[in-house]
Structure formats: C-alpha cells, structure tokens
C-alpha cells in the first residue's frame, strides 16, 4: 500500500512540475493604449498575476468567471467561484495603459511576482 501511495504521489508531483504556462505580449497599439497578453497553457489556470513595466496600467479585461484587479503596474485575476481557464491558447486579457515613453513593454523580471495557480 505504501508503495502504491508513493507512486501516485510521485506521478502527481512530476505532472505538476511539467505543467507550463507561457505568456506573450501581442497587438500593442500605443496610440490607443492597448495590448493583449496571450497565454498558452497545458493545464487549467485558476488565477494569474503579472507585472508590466514601462507603462502605467489603467484597466484589464475580465476572463469569463473571473474578477480582475489592477494597480499601475500589476494585473491580478482570480475567481471566487472556482472557475478556471481551460487548457489551450488565446488572449488572456487586454490591458489599457498610458505613459508609454517609447521603451520596451515587458513583464516583471522577478518570478516571485508572476504567479499562476
């Protein structure tokens, strides 16, 4: 029985380590002050948080079943009902912004601030 539990635990742990989420900034329109955050995920996503630098975030669209909170540099998306974003790829959120000064727009560099669960 212990051997069976160990195998199940090891399998779950390996699957957790192999799950991945990739983000990319696309469709940047500096005149309109919008950009899309595109996501590819091989596991359901129950929430997200990321920072964007070299702009001031005004707002972000809401994935179905989620609440979104923004600060001037961070987007946080979560569900109070247990909703998840299914496996796949597509636009995660569209961000509205100001104060673009011609620099590159990039994600936060500290992995501790870019979280998916």
Q: What is each model feature region?
A:
Residues 18-117:
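Acidic, low-complexity intrinsically disordered segments
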Residues 7-16:
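Bacterial N-terminal signal peptides
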Residues 1-4:
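Positively charged n-region of N-terminal signal peptides that target proteins for export
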């Amino acid at each position: 029985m212990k051997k069976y539990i160990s195998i199940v635990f090891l399998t779950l742990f390996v699957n957790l380590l192999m799950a991945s989420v990739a983000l990319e900034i696309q469709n940047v329109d500096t005149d309109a002050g919008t950009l899309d955050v595109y996501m590819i995920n091989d596991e359901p996503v129950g929430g997200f948080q990321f920072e964007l630098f070299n702009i001031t975030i005004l707002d972000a669209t809401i994935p179905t079943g989620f609440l979104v909170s923004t600060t001037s540099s961070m987007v946080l998306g979560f569900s109070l009902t247990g909703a998840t974003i299914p496996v796949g790829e597509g636009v995660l959120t569209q961000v509205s912004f100001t104060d673009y000064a011609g620099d590159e727009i990039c994600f936060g560099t500290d992995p501790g601030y870019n979280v998916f669960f």
